[in-house]
Swiss-Prot record:
The keyword Iron does not apply. NCBIfam families: serS. One of its GO terms (molecular function) is transferase activity. It comes from Caldicellulosiruptor bescii (strain ATCC BAA-1888 / DSM 6725 / KCTC 15123 / Z-1320). This is Serine--tRNA ligase. Homodimer. The tRNA molecule binds across the dimer. Pathway: Aminoacyl-tRNA biosynthesis; selenocysteinyl-tRNA(Sec) biosynthesis; L-seryl-tRNA(Sec) from L-serine and tRNA(Sec): step 1/1. GO terms for biological process: selenocysteine biosynthetic process; seryl-tRNA aminoacylation. Transmembrane segments: none annotated.
Amino acid sequence: MLDLKYIRANPEKVQEGLSKRNKDVSIAPILELDERRRKLLAEVESLKALQNQKSKEVPKLKKEGKDVTDLMNELKDLSDKIKELDSKVKEVEDEIEKILLTIPNIPHESVPVGKDDTENVEVRRWGEVREPDFEIKPHWEIGVNLGILDFERASKVSGSRFTFYRGLGARLERALINFMLDLHIEKHGYTELFPPFLVARKSMIGTGQLPKFEEDAFKTTDDYFLIPTAEVPVTNYHREEILKEEDLPIKYVAYSACFRAEAGAAGKDTRGLIRQHQFNKVELVKFTKPEDSYDELEKLTADAEDVLKELGLPYRVVLLCSGDLGFSSAKTYDIEVWMPSYGRYVEISSCSNFENYQARRANIRFRRKDGKLDYVHTLNGSGLAVGRTLAAILENFQQKDGTVVVPEVLRKYMGTDVIK
């Protein structure tokens, strides 16, 4: 959530920043409501001062033996009027918060201005793209041929965009999860959390999924939500807390299943593992001091990249332009893995700095050594999306005979060096 005081003090700067997102977002309604709120508050303070003044007259008049009936009636009228105005103030404040929750974050000054993903900027590439001397098969075909992925039975059981992982497919999925967790814990210094997969509405509001994107979420009848990412429970782990400056940055890694309705994804990536209603992901989350957050974003992105380097998968890093930026993010790097059957790079991780946007919504602060309270900056990124990583392994390490070579770092988890 944006800071109302900052909006009030810098309306043109805020509107200019939001306009870079190429979305129709106006802060005019916020400013109008804020002005109304301030006028109401001034009126309340004026009436309270009058009430206080007249209240002091009561004992004085009583001492003089004078009738205070009219004065008491006047005080009652003042009290009723103050209550009425307080109620109006509350209504206006609720409306301000309601609108604030629908306004996205302001892009960081280093984010390139652009309308959509065609104007994202490539930052770097790693690894060599293989050019095999045989016809490349897509991962879903490889998986079915090897008997390790079963889309047909998953469709029978659950509908479209679900998958059964079978035999070495299930083992490969599990190996990837364990490898990613071990790497981030042992090499990168993250603390593991294993979070709930169901969260309350307040948690979804805290990270910015609600109220804007409720149609993309799976909701239960009692107002719980299946998590779209472990970002939600892990960020809310410190909701309504005051952290210690000396404990920052706090770094968590969490495996979870993720659930997405993909309401706006009709016709996109309908085959394979790229766009599923349920998928596994290892998530990285950081809580940092504001002055450190952009350095920490670079480190977090490097940590996610390290997974692909260890696996030997070619990838590139892309800086998202303002028009492609996620709702809550101030700056995002996408990591895209090479997918031979697509003939292009496909997103496998988004690493973002939300600055204090989520922290304000979730009220996560820290106390500086001088005693001052400040909001933390929150960051997160996939480290990585497991199903997409598995798909990339099948495609990049497929052999002419239909087998798939297991990356060396996974062999101790798999107990084999080839899937056949």
